[in-house]
């Protein structure tokens, strides 16, 4: 069995060959990149198996930051015609909203200068082959540099019980809301608020379904769910616009309500607490991006993450991961996410990506959008 180990198993002399595919200049010169023209799809590497991709490093000189959403990364396993990984390049590496950022987690590390060194350590086994390509959905060319470090094995026996890596990117822009009416309830005195909100005064405030939640992952097959990056853009002022009261819900193998895993709030899902208003990075959870102010604490673009690496979530037939956008789905914000998971068989990693215009981030928010509510006292 292939052991994906850290320091604890580093001294074990496993049987493999160390390999790399990179963009080094085959002439011996220093043009160690490939140029990707506007509209071009380029295969960067084709790897022979059995093997396992252990580390990806990439950098590209972007014409504009929004190319983090214009450029698409795709990975195909074992000659499949559909990609198991299909994701905007920046989001694959955890850079939501096309915002470059230095950060460190257990499996993703964006490094200087200014988050341009893109690193990924998710293990990605394959039995026959791996094909890695990028598509430039912009109009301008850019130089692409890369390392794909992988192990190659004499036999696929080393890959017994290993799943294939998949990625699913999604966006809902904006989410449907009923927040102004919710805010009016909340602004009443606490007894009336509790009575109306929690004891059925308005049935919309009592959510016993995942029907209207934001979907982070919907997949069929036998596998494990390993985590997500979630990006929220509070692009306009809303009364009581803290989005963190949205509960996470994970349904396994088509089970009925209630799900096997039901959370207590968005900030609890990413293992923080009490409406965090600061950036924080830990190996398995954190806040990568926070843009709030004293006057508008939840203003603009936020990015958070939760990895299930020490506690992967097992499913055998299907999994459905969703989260409320505000309590009982009251808020209308721009939600996007990248989810990481493994399946026993290589399949398509989620629905096809939307057109590039529907992937681009919203412009950054002014302090108070015209015509929107001033801060609530």
Model-derived regions: residue spans:
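Beta-strand-centric surfaces of beta-sandwich/beta-rich domains
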Residues: 1-377
């Amino acid at each position: 069995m292939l052991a994906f180990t850290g320091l604890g198993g580093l001294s074990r002399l496993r049987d493999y060959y160390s390999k790399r595919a990179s963009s080094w200049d085959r002439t011996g010169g220093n043009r160690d990149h490939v140029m990707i023209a506007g509209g071009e799809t380029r295969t960067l590497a084709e790897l022979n198996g059995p093997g396992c991709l252990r580390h990806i490093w990439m950098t590209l000189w972007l014409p504009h930051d929004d190319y983090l959403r214009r450029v698409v990364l795709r990975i195909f396993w074992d000659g499949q015609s559909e990609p198991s990984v299909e994701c905007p390049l920046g989001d694959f590496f955890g850079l939501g909203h096309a915002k470059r950022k230095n950060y460190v987690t257990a499996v993703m590390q964006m490094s200087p200068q200014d988050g341009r060194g893109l690193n990924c350590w998710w293990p990605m086994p394959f039995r026959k082959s791996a094909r890695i390509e990028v598509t430039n959905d912009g109009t301008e060319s850019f130089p692409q540099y890369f390392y794909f470090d992988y192990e190659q094995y004499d036999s696929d026996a080393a890959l017994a019980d290993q799943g294939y890596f998949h990625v699913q990117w999604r966006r809902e822009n904006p989410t449907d809301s009923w927040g102004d009416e919710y805010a009016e309830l909340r602004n009443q005195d606490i007894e009336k608020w509790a009575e109306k909100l929690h004891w059925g005064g308005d049935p919309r405030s009592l959510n016993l379904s995942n029907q209207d939640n934001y979907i982070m992952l919907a997949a069929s097959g036998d596998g494990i769910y390993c985590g997500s990056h979630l990006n929220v853009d509070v692009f306009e002022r809303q009364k009581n616009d803290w989005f963190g009261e949205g509960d996470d819900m994970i349904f396994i193998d088509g089970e009925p309500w209630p799900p096997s895993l039901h959370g207590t709030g968005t900030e609890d899902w990413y293992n923080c607490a009490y409406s965090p208003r600061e950036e924080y990075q830990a190996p398995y959870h954190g806040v990568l991006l926070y843009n709030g102010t004293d006057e508008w604490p939840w203003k603009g673009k936020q990015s958070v993450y939760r990895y299930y690496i020490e506690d992967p979530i097992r499913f055998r037939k299907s999994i459905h991961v969703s989260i409320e956008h505000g309590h009982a789905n009251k808020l209308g914000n721009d939600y996007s996410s990248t989810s990481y998971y493994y399946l026993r068989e290589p399949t398509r990693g989620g629905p096809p990506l939307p057109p590039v215009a529907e992937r681009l981030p919203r412009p950054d928010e002014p302090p108070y959008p015209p015509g929107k509510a001033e801060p609530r006292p």
